[in-house]
Amino acid sequence: MDQKFYISSLLQEDTPSKEKPETSSESPIPTGSECSLNESSDTTLDQKMEPNKKMFNGTLDFNPWICHVSQQLAAQLSQNGKNRPGAPNQVPLLNMNVNQTMGNMWDPRLSWLYPYMSKSPQKRKGGQIRFTNEQTDALEHKFDSHKYLSPQERKKLAKSLSLSERQVKTWFQNRRAKWRRVRKDGEDEDEMPNGASARSLGQLQSSNPFLSHG
């Protein structure tokens, strides 16, 4: 009896105890295969996270920790989007229109890049000041009577034509230069026939000695 009891005691000690495994309340971390399956089920999230995969040089599919954190973040963002009324069922931060964002970024620069868009037609174009027909006619009419303007007359004329005093002064300077050039060209044309006749007569006398003694 003692020996049998002793053997049974040994067998009982050698037999592994059938204890229930401890259950953990924490959710297990998904492995790489589970992560890839969950990502493939959500095509929208997979497409949006494609640039992030390239940033990690392909390590995102094989790192369960990064995959687990990414899934939790995406789930939280999706849940926040569902709680908002009228919000689409996708990640709000990843659903951004890139073209619209770039357009809004460039809008404040338009006035700085293209200052000529806000200028009136008589402003500079091609390096020259453009005047309207009414302004040109008024300036020509004033130039016919006054080749030079006093500061008071220039200020009054500029105000009546919606121009600056500098523009009026520059126009009169250019107009006087053109007027002198036209006058000089006209005087040269008037002198050309007389000069040509004198030269012709001199050549004729030198070629015919009898005319020189007449």
From Swiss-Prot:
Biased composition (Polar residues): 35-44, 200-214
Family matches, as CDD domains: homeodomain
GO terms assigned for molecular function: DNA-binding transcription factor activity, RNA polymerase II-specific; RNA polymerase II cis-regulatory region sequence-specific DNA binding
Regions recorded as binding DNA: 124-183
Gene Ontology CC terms: nucleus
UniProt-listed GO biological process terms: actin cytoskeleton organization; animal organ morphogenesis; cell differentiation; eating behavior; muscle cell fate specification; nematode larval development; nematode pharyngeal gland morphogenesis; nematode pharyngeal muscle development
Main location: nucleus
A Pfam family annotated for this UniProt entry: Homeodomain
Low complexity: compositionally biased ranges: 24-34
Keyword annotations from UniProtKB, A to Z: DNA-binding, Homeobox, Nucleus, Transcription, Transcription regulation
Gene3D superfamilies: Homeodomain-like
Subcellular location per the Swiss-Prot or TrEMBL entry: Nucleus
Record's keyword annotation contains Transcription: yes
InterPro entries on file: HD, HD_metazoa, Homeobox_CS, Homeobox_DNA-bind_prot, Homeodomain-like_sf, HTH_motif
Highest rank taxon of the organism: Eukaryota
Key word DNA-binding present: yes
Region (Disordered): 1-50, 180-214
Function field: Transcriptional repressor. Involved in pharyngeal development and required for the formation of the pharyngeal isthmus. Plays a role in modulating cytoskeleton in the muscle cells of the isthmus. Regulates expression of the acetylcholinesterase genes ace-1 and ace-2. May regulate its own expression.
Protein name: Homeobox protein HEX homolog pha-2
Organism: Caenorhabditis elegans
Source organism phylogeny: Eukaryota, Metazoa, Ecdysozoa, Nematoda, Chromadorea
